[in-house]
Amino acid sequence: MILNIKAPENIVLKPTITVFGVGGAGSNAVNNMIHANLQGANFVVANTDAQSLEHSLCINKIQLGVSTTRGLGAGASPEVGALAAQESENEIRSSLENSNMVFITAGMGGGTGTGSAPIIARIAKELGILTVGVVTKPFHFEGGHRMKTADKGLIELQQFVDTLIVIPNQNLFRIANEQTTFADAFKMADDVLHAGVRGVTDLMIMPGLINLDFADIKAVMSEMGKAMMGTGEDSGEDRAIKAAESAISNPLLDHSSMCGARGVLINITGGPDMTLFEVDNAANRIREEVDNIDANIIFGSTFNPELKGIIRVSVVATGIDADKVPKYKLAIDENTNTVPKETYNESMIQHTQIEEIPAFNNYSTENIEITDSSIKQNYTENEQELRLHVNAVNKPENNSQKSSFLWKIWGSLRASNNQTLERKNVIVNTLDQDNKESDIHDIPAFLRKKRD
């Protein structure tokens, strides 16, 4: 009997990450990443403009809509861009096969990027690929029509991506100066994509003490909606903390606060001199920004010999509620007991229904008399304070922080012989005459009455 024994093939299993540039802006972003010699990712560019496609540094190129546009571009029409992508669906699908994750980058507001990017994202999702969109919005000087086109494209794109990162070009003015060239400004926007891709690929290919697998990354980024990416590098004293601070404060992104994030991916990379305490300091600084106790925070740390003396921190925060605003603490003038107008604007205050205030629930104020004497008689510093769930106003801590309205309501509740609050629906309809004559800013916006 003859036995044929073969040695098992040495198959290397690793996730495949693809960066897919769409249109002129997407192709330029890919060119910048190739120039930067980014490792660990495949590149594909697709365009309706044959001339632009010819000048791309990328090897894998797709001419979108040969019959639809004849290589002449989409003419700033998203409808034409979408038709071109649909015509080239087989080529797009072929270029994405075997990919585990794809970053789709495009400029919103034009024809090819706005129209084709959602089609490409849909194909990627049909293939079961983790799909991340990183797109830009137009400058203000490009006009309202282009901005509306971009917004419509974003709505369409968001239906098909797991995670979406939006970079408004107008925010480039936050970091540019009078000497910044037009090309350099766009490169700054492309660096957001570069940092995000590098943060993921480093975790895959770089050696480290705490390695992550692709399943970890997918858990943080799958079906998460809006997101932010940031990276920071620093050297010298407190380099880890400074790098973390830079990573979580990206000036190019709107709503870049990590408050409310449902998933956070942290990658800390350094040379052989990176210490345990530095890794701990950087990771904890980022964790402080996340106020969601149920957030899925995944942490990895890798080594890069080229980063001797430097620590790099990359952050991807996903599932961010873009409508959530930071909590503001209104300063109270001790003399007038009012809120100066210049300390806030209406956008800081989120209006809350009175029924949602726990301290008022099911409590009757029918026979409560509000007088200054009752307030002075019953108020002490150590008494339990009235808790109002209003984002714009923090819980009062001392006399100087209490507006006259909140103080009077609290005093009235204290004056009710400390009875147990029974649950009844309450609506506060009237204020005393003194309060009517007080500054309107004494009254929280959600209870403010219109003056006659």
UniProtKB/Swiss-Prot annotation:
CDD domains: FtsZ_type1. The keyword Hydrolase does not apply. PROSITE patterns: FTSZ_1, FTSZ_2. One of its GO terms (molecular function) is GTP binding. GTP binds at G24, A25, G26, S27, N28, G111, T112, G113, E142, R146, D190. InterPro entries: Cell_div_FtsZ, Cell_div_FtsZ_CS, FtsZ/CetZ, FtsZ_C, Tub_FtsZ_C, Tubulin/FtsZ-like_C, Tubulin/FtsZ_2-layer-sand-dom, Tubulin/FtsZ_GTPase_sf. Belongs to the FtsZ family. HAMAP family: FtsZ (MF_00909). Essential cell division protein that forms a contractile ring structure (Z ring) at the future cell division site. The regulation of the ring assembly controls the timing and the location of cell division. One of the functions of the FtsZ ring is to recruit other cell division proteins to the septum to produce a new cell wall between the dividing cells. Binds GTP and shows GTPase activity. NCBIfam families: ftsZ. Homodimer. Polymerizes to form a dynamic ring structure in a strictly GTP-dependent manner. Interacts directly with several other division proteins. This is Cell division protein FtsZ. It comes from Rickettsia typhi (strain ATCC VR-144 / Wilmington). The gene is ftsZ.
